[in-house]
């Protein structure tokens, strides 16, 4: 009888512990979800749509216009990365800019935002538009809000940027466009 009471008490305490852990995990998930409201859009193409050829190697190869909204008020800087994970040699970096002022609301067509330019996979700074060798590729424009300005030189690589941003990202927004050459 005493053994069954102890066993019953053990089961009840275990159940209470599991329920409280589950509730704590749910609260953490909700808190994390509520942090990211920042948005990155473009008037040139919608998320998951084709990027117009004007912004590619088949056109003028200029950067598309981008609109930034709802950046966190406590952000000290923004970082922008555009890459292509479908490249045959692995992810190809098209555009890297960091230490963008957090007050930036738009990046006009064909311009570089105020900030520090990183080095793309062509080994140069600045925008390099989509130019897939074959098939449809996805191009991710990733915007990061950071709680600090980064101490990196011009020409830093995406790997350098990712290392420096670690532990400093307070929000992220993403815009994805596709492109297929029609040669």
Q: Where is each model-derived feature located?
A:
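Bacterial N-terminal signal peptides that target proteins for export
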Residues: 2-9
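Intrinsic disorder/low-complexity segments, especially N-terminal tails and targeting/processing regions
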Residues: 4, 18-20
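Generic detector of short alpha-helix boundary/capping microenvironments
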Residues: 9-10, 36
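Bacterial N-terminal signal peptides
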Residues: 10-18
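N-terminus-centered regions that define maturation/targeting leaders and the start
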Residues: 21-183
